[in-house]
Amino acid sequence: MGQRRAALGTVSGPSTKPTLVVLAAGRARRYGGVKPLAPVGPRGEAVIDLVASDALAAGFGSIVLVLGPATGPAIRYHVEHTWPAHVDVRFALQQVPLGTVHAVLSASEHVGDTPYGVGNADDVYGRSPCSLLAAHLMALDPTNALVGFRLADAVVGTAPVTRGICQVGPDGQLRRVDERRQVTAQPDCRFAAADGREPSELSPDARVSMNLWGFTPAFHKTLQAAMAAASDASEDAEVLLPEVVAESLDTSPFTVLPAAGRCIGVTHPDDLALVQGELARQVGQGVRPAALWAPGENV
């Protein structure tokens, strides 16, 4: 199975379902473990299992996992021994941690010259938001895109988090992403950022970025150029996706796709029980299917 999954290949053709590049190379220092393998599902399913199954059910055709040398072997072993054999999954290695742009470019040979999605390996985005992105990427002439979640739907627990607050124009285009730190939920359903900046109070309806992106082939070239420029300046320069997006908005517009439903992520160890409870609640309410994969799709 491992040799089959390691086979190289590109995704091409205008009618091809898009690929989702899943960034799983992080060290997760705050969590203290391999976050993509955290057992969050009702049956002990890992975060990365839900990320992949939701994406495939929503219209993505293949998954590319960008792994790091420290946690990559454990993640790859898990995938090769638990995912259904028919799932089209490829592996890419980010040997050196040079930021999220470098991580995406590590998957270049697998995405081909077609639009593709990018997401985190430790955020359960849900099927509806993934469906929004997949449908957008399969449009006749797609733009770059960012899936925007309500702030109230993108915070789990009471521990402080960092969130990118999106400023969206009347045309639905992204104007900027304002990173706010120390964001916490308040008792009266408000949100506050204790980062010394104003406004300190944040609207629960504000759209935030949870790093669920859609990129066109033209923007992929922009990422390559940004990484090359940074590497020329310093061999160990880290380049982050939000920074390149912000610098490119004048020439590379991004459509904000407003998502409904919660984005459930694991940031701190104390989040695990909360995430498990939320996912179990979704299954009980019929929002999420009880079985991770469709009947007959077991390994």
Segments from the language model and where they lie:
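Terminal amphipathic alpha-helical/low-complexity segments used for targeting or macromolecular assembly
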Residues: M1-A7, V11-T16, A52, L140, ...
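Conserved N-terminal catalytic core of the sugar/cofactor nucleotidyltransferase
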Residues: G2-V22, A28, P42-V118, Y125, ...
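Residue-level signal for inorganic ion chemistry
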Residues: V22, I48, A107, D122, ...
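Short acidic/His/Gly/Ser-rich catalytic and metal-binding motifs that mark active-site loops
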Residues: R27-G32, Q186-D188, T222
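Phosphate- and divalent-cation-binding pockets in alpha/beta enzyme and binding domains
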Residues: R30, P73-I75, S128, T222, ...
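Short glycine-enriched, charge-decorated loop/helix-capping segments at active-site entrances
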Residues: K35-V40, V161
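A structural signal for short hydrophobic beta-strand segments in well-ordered beta-sheet cores
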Residues: L37, C166-V168, V256
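Conserved core of the sugar-phosphate nucleotidyltransferase
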Residues: G126-W213, P217
